[in-house]
Curated annotation (Swiss-Prot):
It comes from the Eukaryota. This is Protein TIPIN homolog. It comes from Caenorhabditis briggsae. Pfam families: Swi3. One of its GO terms (molecular function) is DNA binding.
Length: 239
């Protein structure tokens, strides 16, 4: 018996450690002498590597949406003498090609049904009305101008020069002569004005950083809203 104890006595020490460390649980509820290790389940975190494409108002009013459809039918002139079904087939091929370029993952009939649903939305109606009136439909530029106008910045359409932005930053002062503390130092008006301009440059830089942060938060909220809209659409439609 002692020999058997010596043989199996160090079984617990010789067993390889579990890859889960101390989280492994030993189950002794079974028969005597039988042991099994219950490993905890790994929590699989869903990592979003690429943003999911969504067929929504933004896509339909973008460069691959209604604008591309108008360009596709710009030179389309059906022959009235031909068979009407042939003309219809040519037209549907253009619709199918346009739908594939805009959203390749969906079938043509599903794309057309989705476009019909989106056509009742206010953003799409406003976009079509602006196109008919010949007004600007560049939503990206309009959003940028609205954001800058809300923050009190007037956008004249000119690009900012990076060199000018860096020139506005305060320069590092290098002392050339040791200051005698016994002498009374009097700041000149030019030096005071330079300090005021440096403070203005720092405030301007901080304001630009704050605007960038707000813009990124707005884009994140819009992307989240688009994902929720697409999830609702997937749940309400059987593909």
């Amino acid at each position: 018996m002692d020999e058997m104890d010596d043989f199996f006595g160090n079984d617990e020490l010789d067993r390889e450690p579990s890859p889960f460390g101390e989280e492994a649980i030993e189950d002794n509820t079974g028969e005597e002498g039988s042991r099994r290790i219950i490993e905890p389940k790994l929590l699989r975190t869903k990592k979003l590597t690429n943003p999911r494409l969504a067929l929504n108002e933004k896509t339909l009013t973008g460069p691959k949406g209604i604008t591309a459809l108008r360009e596709a039918f710009q030179n389309f002139n059906p022959n009235p003498k031909d068979d009407p079904y042939k003309n219809l087939e040519k037209m549907m091929k253009k619709y199918a090609y346009w739908g594939h370029l805009m959203f390749p993952k969906m079938k043509t009939e599903d794309v057309l049904n989705r476009v019909e649903t989106l056509g009742t939305r206010r953003q799409v109606k406003l976009y079509i009305m602006k196109q008919r009136l010949g007004e600007s439909t560049d939503d990206v530029e309009n959003e940028k101008r609205e954001t800058k106008s809300k923050n009190g910045i007037i956008d004249d359409g000119a690009d900012d020069d990076e060199d000018d932005l860096f020139n506005d930053l305060p320069e590092k002062e290098t002392p050339t002569k040791p200051i005698n503390h016994t002498e009374k130092v009097v700041d000149s008006p030019e030096k005071k004005n330079g300090q005021v301009s440096n403070n203005d440059a720092e405030e301007e830089e901080y304001r630009m950083m704050e605007e960038e942060r707000l813009r990124e938060e707005q884009e994140a909220r819009e992307a989240e809203a688009e994902d929720e809209l697409m999830e609702d659409f997937d749940l309400n439609n059987d593909w």
